[in-house]
Curated annotation (Swiss-Prot):
Extent of Acidic residues compositional bias: 628-638
Top-level taxon in the UniProt lineage: Bacteria
Organism expressing this protein natively: Gloeobacter violaceus (strain ATCC 29082 / PCC 7421)
Lineage: Bacteria, Bacillati, Cyanobacteriota, Cyanophyceae, Gloeobacterales
Function statement: Acts as a chaperone.
Molecular functions per Gene Ontology: ATP binding; ATP hydrolysis activity; ATP-dependent protein folding chaperone; heat shock protein binding; protein folding chaperone; unfolded protein binding
Family stated for the protein in its record: Belongs to the heat shock protein 70 family.
Protein name, UniProt field: Chaperone protein DnaK
Induction note: By stress conditions e.g. heat shock.
Amino acid sequence: MGKVVGIDLGTTNSVVAVLEGGQPTVIANAEGSRTTPSVVAFTKNHDRLVGQLARRQAVLNPENTFYSVKRFIGRKYDEITDEAKQVAYRVVRDGSNVKLHSTNEDKDFAPEEISALVLRKLVDDASKYLGEKITQAVITVPAYFNDSQRQATKDAGRIAGIEVLRIINEPTAAALAYGLDKKANETILVFDLGGGTFDVSILEVGDGVFEVKSTSGDTHLGGDDFDRRIVDYLADEFKKLEGVDLRTDRQALQRLTEAAEKAKIELSGVTQTQINLPFITAGADGAKHLDMSLTRAKFESLCADLLRRVEKPVEQALRDAKLSKENIDEVVLVGGSTRIPAVQELVKRIIGKDPNQSVNPDEVVAVGAAIQAGVLSGEVRDVVLLDVTPLSLGVETLGGVATPIIPRNTTIPTRKSETFSTAADGQTSVEIHVIQGERSMAGDNKSLGRFRLDGIPPAPRGVPQVEVTFDIDANGILSVTAKDKASGKAQTISITGASTLSKDDVAKMVNEAESFAGEDKKRREAVDLKNEADSLAYQAERQLTEFGDKVDSSDKSKIEGLIKDLREALSREDMDKVASLKADLQQAVYDLSSKLYQQSAPSGAAAGPDEGAPSGSGGTSGTRGGDDVIDAEFTETK
């Protein structure tokens, strides 16, 4: 088995790590950074930029720069109306699904496709670092991700050409990294507030056993929401002063979003920051500039309700684990948003103790994923990981009632069955509607899929016995079987319908991703060829100047002609001609260098016995034993 990497596919940033010599190592990307922005851009030239390169050009290309895509993955359009308003690019409806529109590509992309490009970069950078092709990974997801979002994340991996060996919950991964070397038993609470999601998990950790006792969270709460409060505040204040709503201009919105994130980060270290955006828009009286100050106190008041929203999941997790805050030994902070002082103070107030900040909140999840990858590949032994399903799973029964089959916080993998019957006399088929959530009515929960079991022998209502079995694998992904006990007929469904993509969609996207990779490779090769050809032309010109009159006029004319033809081919971007002329010019320059070297060889050769120093002279000049030889005494001075 080759190397398996661990990937934290984040809302804002992503990280890849690997085990080396039994120790987890975070892999720097091609730009030298240990975190890669989860940003993808499509340029006018149809180049695909990923990471820092994409982020840098976002202000100039807001409609084709995709960020915070994790907030849309595996979701239906009706579930993301608030999030869609927070981004500068267009989020469009495709039936009930979500697509992201690129004007430069004139195409709608599924969130999975965009995430796949981020995953592909992470794996490519890891392959270069390790010196071997990486094809397998463990990918993390928020603990509170539902079945659709987990399935969609797995689809993103497949589109990127990665075999996803395991989907692992982010707080669980963080606990793995935190507790790997700990022998004493501890009860820890992992508080994970990232760019787009919030999770809290309680685990018992010690001596290689990691048992999740409960998990809770909010997949609509993260650093992006804090940024948005600053954006709205700045936009509202600017509108009062200038009468212009900057949120209606995509470029201005992108600049505001970047400035808001920067201000939020700065306010973790200082109590006041200045936000200065010159030429943010223009009116009839000329350019307008935004120049405002923001204090930490104002920021905290803007986000007060968001901060309060983290309390309920923490309390829920404690209740589900049947623990009080006094039972918690350590609170581990994960995610960049936990650097906000108000968040740290809130955690301290809720739990009653200072949070443990010994781990890097940006990297700890990827490190834990790498450890889990090591467990699966056999590199790490004596580690037992017992995770849970975050939300209850069940079926819709008569009257639209939600009937749970697997309650939330059940340890996975697991398999549970319930027996149901028909609702009408002579009924020969039943529809199984699979749902996920905590509400009492089925319609208020997440619908994961429907399927029919036909061929039930006619009988009075309530007589047939239909056994419904739920099976959750270690990834937290569900399959359901319905079986009529009398006839033995059964129907199984893997809840892939929960994903927003069909198998055909995924297969098509895999093929497109492979062709894009081929196109990108060709484009890179063309750029390299242009740079090499341009450099060669410059070097050839310089050599002609340096050699001057030593170059025959015929050789000079030939090389100058090749340089001229090569530059014309470069301007036409005729790459076949460029390659041919580059080879011809290389040969001509080589031939000229060889010719000039041979011409200079006789005059530069060492003198023979009849010229210069006589044989056996030891390299001393002068004549042997002649009158011109002067003997001198040598005295050493001490």
